[in-house]
Amino acid sequence: MLGKISLLLLPVFVAINLVHSSPEIIKNLSQNFCKAMDQCKQELNIPDSVIADLYNFWKDDYVMTDRLAGCAINCMATKLDVVDPDGNLHHGNAKEFAMKHGADASMAQQLVDIIHGCEKSAPPNDDKCMKTIDVAMCFKKEIHKLNWVPDMDVVLGEVLAEV
């Protein structure tokens, strides 16, 4: 009887563990994604105000509108080879990036699906940087719905410790 109960509860414990670990995984993904920032900052001559935009990205009520922030995100995504030359998500590379930084196959696919859905739902825009902002804000909204948002105090503390 105890064995049957344990088997029934196993998926619950696994699901609880996934929920608790998801913000940590998103934190790892964010930190590793931003490792390309130094190169992009120099290449695009990005001001500190845009860096502040990117640090505030995960805050629930924060809306990123600066075109250069979209350019910076697109630059980092390009450097990490997770987008194609047109700026669209490269599904295989993005999934591989997520798995390399802590996501299991299921979570990695879910992240790819979220971004792909955001690409499809974003209004048409010939400006790649502004299109990237629309996709990023949609992605953030979906991550908030899943309660996967990383603790920004921890993220900022770790980023500042590396500087």
Swiss-Prot record:
One example GO MF annotation: pheromone binding
Tissue expression remark: Antenna.
Cystines in this chain: C40-C75, C71-C129, C118-C138
Record key words, sorted: Disulfide bond, Pheromone response, Pheromone-binding, Signal, Transport
Pfam families: PBP_GOBP (PF01395)
Top-level taxonomic group: Eukaryota
GO-annotated biological processes: response to pheromone
Signal peptide from the UniProt entry: 1-21
Gene3D superfamilies: Pheromone/general odorant binding protein domain
Family, similarity comment: Belongs to the PBP/GOBP family.
Protein's job: This major soluble protein in olfactory sensilla of male moths might serve to solubilize the extremely hydrophobic pheromone molecules and to transport pheromone through the aqueous lymph to receptors located on olfactory cilia.
Full protein name: Pheromone-binding protein 1
